[in-house]
């Protein structure tokens, strides 16, 4: 149940943000909006408000803002006094580009803001210093009296500068003695402790039993740092996608069922974990929608860029046919990955 609720929260925020971006930019450029729908499939509820039909559909796996002139294969009723200049296809290339890119842009902005909120409200592990944030009970560190807030200055005389130095030092294969001489900075004084850290092959070697501290940032700093984190994560997402497409790594793509399970797991771990997950999903959604694939926003943008470069517009019927093919492929992929999710969850 928690997975279903979590999934509905995640997909609602992502889809409404994405389609809201299209809607607002279309309104700004005076494009006729026939429908704003959340979900796919048969309509469960709808209400006409002005020129736009607002609807809720059966399957919460997406949404649509239906614009006049976006797909020439469909004929929608026009309001009384309709002006053909309100068709998306009649707008200038930069206006069409703006409307198409605005959905993914809103997802990327939301990912940036959610990451900034995480950095400001919860913080991230401080890996730049050997500062102890938590000591696990029943571990060598706990038995030796190491406390949260201690800074591990050295181990066996080796000075430590960052968190990873702790693991590297105690995992040194050249060290055979289980007794480690650790120097701590506690407040304004230095403390020396001898810690018995026996080898533990089950956990990959010696385990001290400490976790790093967390560092939070003022909101202005969090907003700036979030840009860097989001950029780095986006690059890794695109690298991973490229490696999957070139078969350098095995595909581990998940569909709606897999996302629901992951959303539920994130919420069980706490609100900050859920916010982090929501940010990552928005980043994925924004980037994937900008890929130059037919039917995706990025695929439609490619046609506009080609028009801007050549001065010639691709015939609408041909563009519509290409996007229709893209839709069929995407639907097939959704069915495929959903089937894989179900097999992975219930039959393995």
Model-flagged regions — what are they?
Residues 177, 312-333:
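Multi-pass membrane catalytic core of lipid/isoprenoid biosynthesis enzymes
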Residues 243-247, 281-296:
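Transmembrane alpha-helix interface/packing and boundary motifs in multi-pass membrane proteins
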Residues 2-80, 291-310:
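Small-residue-rich helix-interface/hinge motifs
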Residues 45-48, 131-134, 219, 305-321:
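Membrane interface segments of multi-pass transport proteins and intramembrane proteases
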Residues 336-348:
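Juxtamembrane boundary at the C-terminal end of a transmembrane helix
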Residues 71-94, 102, 106-257, 261:
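PDZ peptide-recognition modules
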Residues 3-7, 91-100, 273-277:
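Residue-level signature of transmembrane alpha-helical entry/exit and packing/kink sites
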């Amino acid at each position: 149940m928690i997975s279903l609720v979590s999934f509905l929260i995640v997909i609602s925020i992502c889809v409404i943000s994405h389609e809201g971006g299209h809607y607002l930019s279309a309104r700004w450029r005076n494009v006729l909006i026939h429908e704003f729908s959340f979900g796919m499939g048969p309509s469960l509820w709808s209400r006409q408000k002005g020129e736009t039909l607002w609807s809720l559909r059966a399957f919460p796996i997406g949404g649509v803002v239906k614009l006049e002139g976006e797909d020439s294969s469909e004929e929608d009723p026009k309001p009384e006094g309709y002006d053909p200049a309100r068709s998306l296809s009649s707008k200038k290339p930069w206006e069409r580009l703006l409307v198409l890119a605005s959905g993914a842009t809103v997802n990327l902005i939301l990912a940036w803001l959610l990451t900034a909120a995480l950095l400001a409200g919860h913080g991230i592990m401080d890996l730049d210093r050997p500062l102890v944030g938590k000591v696990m009970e029943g571990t060598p560190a706990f038995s030796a009296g190491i406390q949260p807030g201690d800074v591990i200055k050295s181990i066996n005389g080796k000075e430590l500068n960052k968190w990873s130095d702790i693991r590297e030092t105690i995992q040194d294969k050249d060290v055979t003695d289980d007794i480690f001489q650790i120097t701590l900075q506690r407040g304004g004084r230095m403390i020396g402790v001898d810690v018995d850290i026996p080898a533990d092959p089950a956990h990959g070697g010696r385990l001290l039993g400490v976790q790093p501290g967390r560092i939070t940032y003022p909101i202005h700093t969090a907003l700036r740092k979030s840009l860097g984190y989001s950029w780095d994560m986006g690059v890794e997402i695109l690298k991973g996608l490229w490696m999957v497409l070139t078969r350098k790594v095995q595909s581990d793509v998940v569909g709606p069922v897999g996302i629901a399970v992951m959303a539920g797991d994130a919420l069980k771990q706490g609100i900050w974990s859920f916010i982090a997950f929501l940010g990552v999903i928005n980043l994925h959604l924004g980037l994937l929608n900008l890929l130059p694939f037919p039917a995706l926003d990025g695929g439609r943008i490619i046609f506009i860029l080609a028009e801007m470069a050549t001065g010639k517009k691709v015939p609408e019927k041909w563009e519509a046919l290409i996007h229709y093919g893209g839709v069929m492929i995407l639907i097939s992929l959704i069915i495929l990955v959903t089937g894989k999710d179900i097999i992975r969850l219930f039959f393995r």
